[in-house]
């Protein structure tokens, strides 16, 4: 993905990205203080917001193969299982129940499979949101502060699963987190934002 001369005005705030390359199959981090424009950039990449100027070249990537996780997951009224398979129904896809059970067990949620999703703890909800994001095998996954305010065990499960995915069938990630150690441990490249602009990147 290549972003060139991107501009998006949001009242008194202006997002201006001269050049940004998101390499496929890599874990990219996006860092910066609150209010620097990270979420606006992510929503523009996802097509939720329309840019005022510039281009986002997806280089053949289908937006239907992209997904975005927020800090506070939105869960459906229904069971844990129903929440996981919801993205599959939207895309007319099928995954065997054995695969769903495997993911639930890996995330420590198999015992809660038939419980109402909204009865889960905050950490369990984030793990469920993560499983729902990966179940349809997207090519591009955005995580906007998904790892924030999580208990250490849940955070470790998610980060370990990200690493496992990258070892077997790499996808592209764009991860926003204020946790410096976790970001440095996970990411291949980190892009730093300030006042709506990319000011630096490290690999």
Language model segments and positions:
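Conserved ABC ATPase signature
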Residues: 116-120
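Catalytic Walker B motif of ABC-type/P-loop ATPase nucleotide-binding domains
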Residues: 141-145
């Amino acid at each position: 993905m290549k972003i060139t001369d991107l501009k998006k005005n949001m009242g008194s705030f202006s997002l201006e990205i001269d050049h940004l390359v998101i390499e496929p199959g890599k874990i990219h981090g996006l860092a910066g203080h609150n209010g620097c424009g990270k979420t606006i950039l992510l929503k523009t990449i996802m097509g939720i917001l329309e840019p005022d100027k510039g281009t986002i070249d997806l280089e053949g990537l289908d937006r239907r193969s992209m997904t975005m996780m927020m800090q506070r997951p939105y869960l459906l009224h229904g069971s844990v299982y129903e929440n996981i398979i919801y993205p599959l129904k939207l895309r007319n896809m099928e995954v065997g129940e054995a695969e769903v059970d495997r993911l639930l067990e890996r995330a420590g949620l198999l015992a809660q499979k038939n419980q109402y999703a909204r009865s889960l703890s905050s950490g369990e909800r984030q793990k469920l949101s993560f499983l729902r994001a990966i179940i349809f095998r997207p090519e591009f996954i955005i995580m906007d502060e998904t790892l924030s305010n999580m208990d250490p065990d849940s955070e470790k499960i998610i980060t370990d699963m990200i690493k496992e995915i990258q070892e077997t069938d790499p996808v592209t990630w764009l991860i926003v987190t204020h946790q410096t150690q976790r970001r440095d441990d996970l990411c291949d490249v980190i892009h730093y934002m300030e006042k709506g602009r990319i000011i630096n990147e490290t690999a």
